[in-house]
A protein has these predicted regions:
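Active-site-proximal alpha-helical scaffold in enzymes
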Residues: 77-90, 139-143, 147-191, 229-250, ...
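Conserved beta-ketoacyl condensing-enzyme motif
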Residues: 7, 23, 28-161, 190-199, ...
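A glycine- and small-aliphatic-rich helix-loop capping segment at beta-alpha/alpha-beta transitions
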Residues: 21-28, 112-126, 176-179, 199-212, ...
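Condensing-enzyme catalytic core mediating Claisen C-C bond formation in acyl metabolism
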Residues: 4-8, 35, 213-289, 298, ...
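ACP-dependent fatty acid/polyketide chain-elongation machinery
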Residues: 1-66, 243-255, 350-364, 408-412
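Acyl-CoA/ACP chain-elongation machinery
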Residues: 181-226, 259-273, 303-310, 327-377
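Glycine-/small-residue-rich "gating" segment that lines the acyl/pantetheine channel
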Residues: 124-130, 171, 175, 191-247, ...
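Phosphate/pyrophosphate-binding loops at sites that engage ATP/ADP/AMP, CoA/4′-phosphopantetheine
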Residues: 84-96, 245-249, 282-298, 320-324
Length: 412
């Protein structure tokens, strides 16, 4: 019999706030984190906007010497993980470190580090490359650094499934606890790829919005959408086996109820046009949660603001929920924080938890004219206040990776 898994801690570094409190205040107020790019000179680029993390000072959130040996994606993960761990109230003096794991995904890792050192290699020769380039840039170092900083000696892995990385990480952590491999797991996603090659690459792929207006560049499910806005940051949760959490008197935010993961086997960047792959992930998550489609109160969609994703994801929701797809409330957090890539799914699970807690579904800002081809019940224009017992979070990644996670209101 699978063990029950609950959420006891949360942490976030995002374009609208560098703590859970700041982030959620921004979400509730409909704040946008999209602004002109400042990380580099983008004057010659077609894309001028990004959702950058602001006012983040690594040495204020972690050991200064350790921070110097981390790229931003690792720093964001460590900061968010420390917040989540403290929020959970875990005391390592009372815990078996081999029963606490770390599963943190990143879709890209240290792209900027690779970029800068390649430039050094070309201009100044191989002797000038940073000797720490490899451990700085490889994507598993977010999990590695969190494990080191918190002293966690259980299973430690990095899930890389593009923009589904954070969601898969939480799902895999859920499984590890359900089947007894761990009692606690620090899980989520992180990303920091707002750099020249990152923006140029996504632009060449025609994935990014070229809209110069920060207020309307990210407008998921809008008929005039033209691409996503690249974002960055980290979202981390502490997952815990229910009896372990109860035994130490932990505050329980919500329960992990379902996890579905599928592959489209269709295209390297586009979701399956009929939505069957993502739809099946939702069906699998509902099956594990033991619920019917009409019991899903809220869907936090992948909702990237690209033509293909929003249309095909809407089809996937219809595929999975049938008639219930017409009434379930759907939104996209990416309208506020842009597409945080490997961190997106984890941050959006946090939104689901906070939405259950506050009985509040944020609006999808920037979206004004719903695409009739998408045509579902998107929260646009104003937030929705309603009791939420089951919230679903969808994540889709290049390569055909589909993940659906269901979070439920905790009850004994």
């Amino acid at each position: 019999m699978k063990r029950r898994v609950v959420i006891t801690g949360m942490g976030a570094v995002t374009p609208i706030g560098n703590t859970i409190e700041e982030f959620w205040d921004g979400i509730r107020s409909g704040k946008s984190g999209i602004d002109p790019i400042t990380h580099f000179d983008a004057s010659e680029y077609k894309v001028k906007l990004a959702a950058e993390v602001k006012n983040f000072v690594a040495k204020e959130r972690m050991d200064f010497k350790a921070a110097k040996r981390m790229e931003s994606f690792s720093q964001y993960a460590v900061a968010a993980a420390k917040e989540a761990f403290e929020d959970a109230g875990l005391d390592m003096a009372e815990e078996d470190p081999y029963r606490i794991g770390t599963i943190i995904g990143s879709g890209i890792g240290g792209l900027e580090c690779h970029e800068k050192n390649y430039k050094k290699l070309q201009e100044r020769g191989p002797g000038r490359v940073n000797p720490l380039m490899i451990p700085l840039m490889i994507s598993n170092m977010a999990a590695g650094n969190v494990s080191i900083q918190l002293g966690l000696k259980g299973k430690c892995t990095d899930v890389v499934t593009a923009c589904a990385s954070g969601a898969n990480s939480i799902g895999d952590a859920m499984r590890a606890i359900q089947y007894g491999d761990l009692d606690v797991c620090v899980a989520g996603g992180t990303e920091a790829s707002i750099c020249p090659s990152g923006v140029a690459g996504f632009t060449a792929l025609t994935a990014l919005s070229c809209n110069p207006d920060p207020a309307s560049a990210s407008r998921p499910f809008d008929k005039d959408r033209d691409g996503f806005v690249i974002g960055e940051g980290a979202g981390i949760v502490v997952l815990e086996e229910l009896e372990h959490a109860k035994a130490r008197g932990a505050r329980i935010y919500a329960e992990m109820a379902g996890y579905g993961s599928t592959g489209d086997a269709y295209h390297i960047t586009s979701p399956a046009e009929d939505g069957s792959g993502a739809g099946m992930a939702m069906k699998l998550a509902m099956k594990e949660a033991g619920i019917q489609p009409e019991q899903v109160d809220y869907i936090n969609a992948h909702g990237t603001s690209t033509h293909h994703n929003d249309l095909f994801e809407s089809r996937a929701i219809r595929y999975a929920l049938g008639k219930a797809a017409e009434t379930v409330v759907i939104n996209s957090t990416k309208s506020m924080v842009g597409h945080m890539l490997g961190a997106a799914g984890a941050v959006e699970v946090i939104v689901c938890v906070k939405s259950i807690e506050d009985q509040f579904i944020h609006q999808t800002i920037g979206t004004e004219h719903i695409d009739p081809e998408c045509g579902l019940n998107y929260a646009v224009g104003s937030p929705v206040e309603k009791k939420i017992d089951y919230a679903m979070s969808n994540s889709l990644g290049f390569g055909g990776h589909n993940v659906s996670l269901i979070v439920k209101r905790y009850e004994e």
